[in-house]
Amino acid sequence: MDKLLERFLNYVSLDTQSKAGVRQVPSTEGQWKLLHLLKEQLEEMGLINVTLSEKGTLMATLPANVPGDIPAIGFISHVDTSPDCSGKNVNPQIVENYRGGDIALGIGDEVLSPVMFPVLHQLLGQTLITTDGKTLLGADDKAGIAEIMTALAVLQQKNIPHGDIRVAFTPDEEVGKGAKHFDVDAFDARWAYTVDGGGVGELEFENFNAASVNIKIVGNNVHPGTAKGVMVNALSLAARIHAEVPADESPEMTEGYEGFYHLASMKGTVDRADMHYIIRDFDRKQFEARKRKMMEIAKKVGKGLHPDCYIELVIEDSYYNMREKVVEHPHILDIAQQAMRDCDIEPELKPIRGGTDGAQLSFMGLPCPNLFTGGYNYHGKHEFVTLEGMEKAVQVIVRIAELTAQRK
């Protein structure tokens, strides 16, 4: 455990922010730097079959140290950080023995406050690693990486019985490309766990069904003084479209298992407007109904337009709820829950109001629920992680490996 914090601080010092709308994978050069560093560290630790693909997926194996037909299992984290907030020049603050109250983030006005983030009340006495208020921290998912690397070291140093342990570090998870180039056959694990969750005890095997909706609106612009009966304002059409979307089914109005429509971006002029929505729902039937709703809205608003003016809608599915795949293998969850209890942690099964690489991997034949990292408030300058939470994650990973070795 001694090197856990050292590893984490080393990894977050590298800017690995991914970038949307880029064809190449990984989308940024910084991700390659971390991948090459991890490859070097895995080789130094003596892992075998260490490979780094041209698409930036790093894989390695810690060979079994006990005989028998023990299933190979995997642990996976992603190297990129969110495009939503800068990941350059991350300057972590270490707050030992947190005593409550606000934590100043750097020398500006930003604070980490229990008024805004009540979870802090539960973390008294712990060591918090925060940002300086200028960047995100990168615990999502460099905490997961540090935890996997430390767990490998613990398994080796303490000679804990285990089967083959596969590990993988992927790029571009935050822009939805993390699993698209993942070679499940080469990974060769019976099942895996992403280490990409939040607070201690979280175990997630349900996530949103997800789709993106891109709407192109073509209008007609003329001088406003002579516009009657001629102008078709694309911006007005965009406003009408959004007015038809249920206002009480937006991200800021929903929680738990509730789905939503989210207008993520809108831009345009009288001539042309573009809207980008994301649709999310845990229930597959409701998910399909939401997509139909968007098509109906576009058809309604576009009815009667001049042929040269039109509304074009393109819907693309992004990922699906992995629950339907994971529940076919209940022992995967049983082992994780038992491992947590053995580490004095009460498992908290909760839905992911988002997605992980594991969602896509589960539909590619690799059932892959998600384990906690001990981090909070991802994707922004209030992100933080607890050292104690990271240590617990290491213990759970090690215990999962140990329990799996007992399933001969």
Swiss-Prot record:
Matches recorded under InterPro entries: ArgE/DapE_CS, Bact_exopeptidase_dim_dom, Peptidase_M20, Peptidase_M20_dimer, Peptidase_M20B
Top enzyme category: hydrolase
Cofactor note: Binds 2 Zn(2+) ions per subunit.
Principal subcellular localization: cytoplasm
Active site: 80, 173
Residues that bind Zn(2+) 1: 78, 140, 196
Zinc keyword on record: yes
EC number: 3.4.11.4
Protein family (similarity comment): Belongs to the peptidase M20B family.
Function noted in UniProt: Cleaves the N-terminal amino acid of tripeptides.
HAMAP family: Aminopeptidase_M20
Protein name in UniProt: Peptidase T
Gene that encodes it: pepT
